């Protein structure tokens, strides 16, 4: 454990921070020799970091593994050994020169495939997100409509309960609630006989109003009243009376 901590400190301080500062100085002074030296070091150190990630998993159990790693980093940095320059000239540069074209082709193919994969995955992700948003909105709308429906039913029950209670007017008398009046009006509206009567009653005032309106607009003509002569009682018919025959006494006396 102690050797692992020491090796990590050595790699961070001597393998990363010190070369980074030296590279800054080389860029600042525009010293081509130092610039080339530290560029070779960073190329070798990149391969070392990649190999270290694998060897820490596989060879960490090996005795003196971390001590050997510390010694290797010091060998790379030492101005006497110039390990980074030796490794670059003998191994790294010849290998990269032989495989440069293949590496470039792999890089271009990987870039194109990664771009296509990213576009495909992005489109699929957008479709999934849109579908999820639509389903969530539909579910939310359904829940909201159910809640509104439940609230409306509760309000209706409350209104019916309030309608059942009689209201007391200012004069102390009980009066029907407006809800009950509405119910009775609806019931009367449903009755066909009452609807017919109401239709006739509604039609009569219109005619009366129209006649009154016409009377107001055009003055009525007053017909002169003719005096009807009173019928005279019929003359009594004279009864024809037959003359009485003279009595026979007068004849006898003659």
Curated annotation (Swiss-Prot):
Record-linked Pfam families: TB2_DP1_HVA22
InterPro entries given in the database record: TB2_DP1_HVA22 (IPR004345)
Keywords, sorted A to Z: Membrane, Phosphoprotein, Transmembrane, Transmembrane helix
Membrane topology qualifier: Multi-pass membrane protein
GO CC terms, sorted: cytoplasmic microtubule; endoplasmic reticulum; endoplasmic reticulum membrane; endoplasmic reticulum tubular network
Polar residues composition-biased segments: 195-204
Modified sites of kind Phosphoserine: 152
Keyword Nuclease carried by entry: no
Transmembrane segments: 1-21, 35-55
GO molecular function: microtubule binding; taste receptor binding
Region Disordered: start-end pairs: 164-254
Chief subcellular location: membrane
GO biological process, one term: endoplasmic reticulum tubular network organization
Top-rank taxon, per record: Eukaryota
Biased composition (Basic and acidic residues): 205-219
Compartmental location: Membrane
Function statement: Required for endoplasmic reticulum (ER) network formation, shaping and remodeling. May enhance the cell surface expression of odorant receptors.
Subunit structure: Interacts with odorant receptor proteins.
Family stated for the protein in its record: Belongs to the DP1 family.
Matching PANTHER family: HVA22-LIKE PROTEINS (PTHR12300), RECEPTOR EXPRESSION-ENHANCING PROTEIN 2 (PTHR12300:SF29)
Designated name of the protein: Receptor expression-enhancing protein 2
Organism listed in the record: Bos taurus (Bovine)
Highest classification ranks of the organism: Eukaryota, Metazoa, Chordata, Craniata, Vertebrata
Name of the coding gene: REEP2
């Amino acid at each position: 454990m102690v050797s692992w901590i020491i090796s990590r400190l050595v790699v961070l301080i001597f393998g990363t921070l010190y070369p980074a500062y030296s590279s800054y100085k080389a860029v600042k002074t525009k010293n081509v020799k130092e610039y080339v030296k530290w560029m070779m070091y960073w190329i070798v150190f990149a391969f070392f970091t990649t190999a270290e990630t694998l060897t820490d998993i596989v060879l960490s159990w090996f005795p003196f593994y971390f001590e050997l790693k510390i010694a290797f980093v010091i060998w790379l940095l030492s101005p006497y050994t110039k390990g980074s320059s030796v490794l670059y000239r003998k191994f790294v540069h010849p290998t990269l020169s032989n495989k440069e074209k293949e590496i470039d082709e792999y890089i271009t193919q990987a870039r194109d495939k990664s771009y296509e994969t990213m576009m495909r995955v992005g489109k699929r992700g957008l479709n999934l997100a849109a579908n999820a948003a639509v389903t969530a909105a539909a579910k939310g709308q359904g829940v909201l409509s159910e809640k509104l429906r439940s609230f409306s039913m509760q309000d209706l029950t409350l209104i019916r309960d309030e309608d059942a209670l009689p209201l007391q007017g200012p004069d102390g008398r009980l009066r029907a609630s407006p809800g009950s009046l509405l119910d009775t009006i609806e019931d009367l509206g449903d009755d066909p006989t009452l609807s017919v009567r109401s239709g006739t009653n509604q039609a009569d005032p219109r005619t009366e109003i129209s006649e009154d309106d016409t009377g107001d607009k055009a003055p009525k003509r007053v017909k002169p009243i003719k005096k009807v002569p009173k019928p005279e009682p019929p003359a009594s018919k004279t009864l024809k009376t037959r003359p009485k025959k003279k009595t026979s006494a007068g004849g006898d006396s003659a």
